Structure formats: structure tokens, C-alpha cells
Amino acid sequence: GGGGAPPSPGRSSELSGVALTQKLSEKRAAFEERFRATFPGIPSEGGEAEDVARYGLSNMLGGIGYFHGRSRISDQEAGPASQYSHYWEAGLFSAVPSRSFFPRGFLWDEGFHQLLVWKWDRALSREIVGSWLDLLNANGWIPREQILGAEARSRVPDEFVVQRTTNANPPALLLPVLKMAEHLRGLPEGERGADPTHAFLEAAFPRLQVWYDWY
């Protein structure tokens, strides 16, 4: 048996029964209010369009995860799956196209994912874009699929696991970066420097330049 302390009776009562039901109701109402304020162009008040949009956002946010491991890479355009080198050990904070079928980060997809995430939570989007830029090597290349760890590899046929440094996706990750720049341009000049996005883009620019030069 474990040696941990038993849960506090006060804490368990705070998160059960009527108190839990009330808290869930409050959180749901807060989500609905924030959703309608963030996406005012969607027909609201329980319509089908709003339901579909809400499900889409929830699935996107629910698919965000942290992955850790080492990519298998090769500088050859083709070759057997058994011939590869290891990228450095790295973590990635990212959304995924599908939690059940594609539980890994895709560089191309993530640019489009972040157009939605940015509208919902700017700080979260900055964290994710920054996590991808941390995977940039000295030449400006980012492995386009992040197959990190045994769990991610189990969902990928062997012939597609190795990431080849001759291959790249279109730089869709620039799409949310452009949204960030547009956000800053929309602020009064005196407020731009204090916005967290300003510091983020300033720090990210050297990596974005190296990435651009790789293309």
C-alpha cells in the first residue's frame, strides 16, 4: 500500500456533490460567455453553427499535449528505416491533428491550429509557437513530424518515422506569427512594448530568420 496522507475531508467536500455541480455550472457559463465574446460572428443562442464551432474549439484545446523524446532523422533523401541518427532529446508542447490517429505534432498543421488557439488564448499560442521554434537546428531545419517517444512511434508505419533533412513543409507556422504582428500594429504605439507578444516576437525573430533562410 501507499504511504501517502489521506485526502483532506474539507477538500473532498469542496469538489463533490452540490458544490461540484455548482462549480461545473459556473465554469460552463464562463466558457459560454468567453466563447461568444471571442467569436461574435457565429450565430449564438444554442444554434447548430454555435454547437459545431464550440465542439471544434474544444477538440482543438483538448488535443494540446506535451511530448518528449528524440526524433529519428537522416540527411539522405531515401533509405531504409533502420538507417537514422537521433535528434537531440527534446520536448514539444503542441496541438495535434487527431488525438486517436495522429497523436503527434505536425509542423504544417500547427500553423493552422494556432490561428484558432491565438484567438482564444494568446499566451497559450505563444508557448506553443515558441516550443516549435526550440526544435530548430543550426541550419534552420525543423523536423516536420514530431514522432517523440514509443507511444507516438506506435502510431506511425516504420517507413515514415525517419524525418529527412531534405524534406520540409510549407512554413505555415508564419501564419500565427503574422497574426501576432498584426495584433501589435493594432495597439497604440506607446503600449506595444509592454505587450508580452512584443517580447516574444523580439526573442523569436533570430530563429524565424534562420528558418526563413533555410527555405
Task: Identify the role of each PLM range.
Residues 1-215:
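Acidic, mature catalytic/reactive cores of soluble proteins
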